[in-house]
Structure formats: structure tokens, C-alpha cells
Amino acid sequence: MDEQTRIELEAAAFRRLLQHLRDHTDVQNIDLMLLADFCRNCLAKWYGAAAKERGIEMEYPAAQEIIYGMPYAEWKAKYQKEATPEQLKAMEEIQRRKEAADH
């Protein structure tokens, strides 16, 4: 497979991932973090970093809007639910493990 075709396939898969996340607003970012150690905000950060690597200035809110398909504040108001105590405890444990691994 040539590089251009590979890039086009990767881009198509990424667009499909974004649409899947937009269609499944019931899946909360904290759920994604707990299961896969990334979330929509991570994707926005990676998107913005990729833009910066190519000399394109992009503010984080603009990257979030690309990932969420709407301004983050709007998505949060419509779809984000309060994290449960169990979810928060699990996130704290993951953070502790990450910090311990970094030392």
C-alpha cells in the first residue's frame, strides 16, 4: 500500500471514530478514561499538537470543537453527567499509579 492511500485510510478511520463518539454521547469521557486511558479531550489535545507540528496555530477550544462537533461548553451542557463517586475514586487510583510509574 502506498503512503497516500494509507494516510487516506487513516483519515477515514479517524473521521469514523469521531462520528461514532458524536453518535454515542451517552459514553462519558470519564468512562473512556477508565477503560482506555484517553477521551475526547485527549483527542482534541492530540489534534492541536498535530496542527502545531505543521505550523498551524490552533487554540484548544477550536480543536475541541472539531472533535466534539460543537463547542465543548455546549456538549458539556447537553451531554456530560456528574461523575459518580466510584468513577472519581477509580480515576484517582489511575492517577496514583501513573504518578508512581513516573518516579
Residue ranges: model-predicted function:
Residues 1-103:
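Domain-level signature for proteins that mediate thiol-based redox and metal-cofactor handling
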